[in-house]
């Protein structure tokens, strides 16, 4: 049953109906539409449209419908209803008769869908925050188990300075903390109810919209009806949150793909998150990580698409805004799936400590320590930087590590270098000296793990 039609003398072309209908995707708002309808029925009692007995009948029927939806949400798709609002109203009329036709009094699908979508977004934010925290917990536990796993840190994908696998894990804990805080900020701005704003000019019934907002679990009601039915900022914000979050997961995936490669060989991934080749029997491919990396693009695309949909729309509601849902649903589903998969990848990862240490000892990752040593001897840093660069060239010429050069070789670049330089160039010394907050020293990493555990567990 269409919720309109009196104005029309011809039925809609079936091709237009298929083009126009949205039930195939907005069926996901069924629970929110029913919850909003229950609250609206209560509001109609306060203005005399419904009496208490009528409201009870409607609420009971809606509660039964909610149970049916929760038991089998996909059954909705068998209907030819235009959208989820039409479907709910039709089902309600089936249960209570003409009384169901009174429920839409004073309400428009414009404020109805805006309310439904905000309720759905609130629930999704909670789900995403939980998944973010679970991944953070997995990272912290992996870090705690690998505090002694020394590995090279990279800039420009070249070995730069030694770090630990634990320190690498904690870097992503911080990124995810920002992701969670962005979700929380988004929630603060979307936590206002548009219900009662009608099509665009507000409802003609003196409904207490603040009370109505409270019944629905919103912090307050919106202030302007025209803005309320036009607003999709929360969709853009959530898509932005998802896009940034997926960038972080893509970087996480790329790091581990490299660490797992034969060239690095720092980690082994579990068989549970890898696959083989149909031709090459030896292959063990990091498919879970590659899919996380690959899915980043579709989320970015959803954000770009929604930006383009909204950029030229006049106030208030336009049918273009029906395009707000499919991209949002897919993007948040994708982000949630990738968060869960990233945690699964960490469950069973094996860090190959000897290989990590071997790599950290190569590539002259202790060169900065030699520069700092010279500074401590009174050499200006810029001059020390140049001296160490020359020493590295000599080490490369001899095919040796810096710490393997003879003292006489080092002293040809600076006479202040003495025997005390060799302990400074040791790998562990490179870590131990990074004692400032956020550094890679064992004490700082242990402190960061303890702080993260206190915050996340």
Curated annotation (Swiss-Prot):
Coiled coil: none annotated. It is found in: Cytoplasm. Pathway: Amino-acid biosynthesis; L-arginine biosynthesis; L-arginine from L-ornithine and carbamoyl phosphate: step 3/3. GO terms for biological process: arginine biosynthetic process via ornithine; L-arginine biosynthetic process. Keywords: Amino-acid biosynthesis, Arginine biosynthesis, Cytoplasm, Lyase. Belongs to the lyase 1 family. Argininosuccinate lyase subfamily. This is Argininosuccinate lyase. It comes from Yersinia pseudotuberculosis serotype O:3 (strain YPIII).
């Amino acid at each position: 049953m269409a919720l309109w039609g009196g104005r029309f003398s011809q039925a809609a072309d079936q091709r237009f109906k298929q083009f126009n209908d949205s039930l195939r995707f907005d069926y996901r708002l069924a629970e929110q539409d029913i919850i909003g309808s229950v609250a609206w029925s209560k509001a109609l009692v306060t203005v005399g449209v419904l009496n208490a007995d009528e409201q009870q009948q409607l609420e009971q029927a809606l509660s039964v419908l909610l149970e049916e939806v929760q038991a089998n949400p996909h059954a909705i798709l068998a209907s030819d209803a235009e959208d989820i609002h039409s479907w709910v109203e039709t089902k309600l009329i089936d249960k209570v008769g003409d009384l169901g036709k009174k429920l839409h009094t004073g309400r428009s699908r414009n404020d109805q869908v805006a309310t439904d979508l905000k309720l759905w977004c609130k629930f999704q934010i909670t789900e995403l925050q939980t998944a973010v925290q679970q991944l953070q917990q997995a990272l912290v536990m992996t870090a705690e188990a690998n505090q002694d796993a020394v590995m090279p840190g990279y800039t420009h994908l070249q070995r730069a300075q030694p770090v630990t696998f634990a320190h690498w894990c904690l870097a992503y804990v911080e990124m995810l903390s920002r992701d969670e805080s962005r979700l929380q900020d988004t929630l603060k701005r979307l936590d206002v109810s548009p219900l009662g704003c009608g099509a665009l000019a507000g409802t003609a019934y003196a409904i207490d919209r603040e009370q109505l907002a409270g019944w629905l679990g919103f912090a307050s009601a919106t202030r302007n009806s025209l803005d309320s039915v036009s607003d999709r900022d929360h969709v853009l914000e959530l898509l932005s949150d998802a896009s940034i979050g997926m960038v972080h997961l893509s970087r996480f995936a790329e790091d581990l793909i490299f660490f797992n490669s034969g060239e690095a060989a720092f980690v082994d991934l579990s068989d549970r998150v890898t696959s083989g080749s149909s031709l090459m029997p030896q292959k063990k491919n990091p498919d879970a990580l590659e899919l996380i990396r690959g899915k980043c693009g579709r989320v970015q695309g959803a954000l770009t698409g929604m930006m383009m949909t909204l950029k030229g729309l006049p106030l208030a509601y336009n049918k273009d805004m029906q395009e707000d849902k499919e991209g949002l649903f897919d993007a948040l589903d994708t982000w949630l799936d990738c968060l869960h998969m990233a945690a699964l990848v960490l469950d069973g990862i094996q860090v190959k400590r000897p290989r990590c240490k071997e790599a950290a000892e190569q590539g002259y990752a202790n060169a900065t320590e030699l520069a700092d040593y010279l500074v401590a001897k009174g050499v200006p840093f810029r001059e020390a930087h140049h001296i160490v660069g020359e020493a590295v060239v000599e080490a490369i010429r001899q095919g040796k590590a810096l710490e393997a050069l003879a003292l006489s070789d080092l002293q040809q670049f600076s006479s202040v270098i003495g025997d005390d330089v060799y302990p400074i160039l040791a790998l562990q010394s490179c870590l131990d000296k990074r004692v400032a907050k956020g550094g890679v020293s064992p004490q700082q990493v242990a402190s960061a793990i303890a702080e993260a555990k206190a915050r996340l567990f």
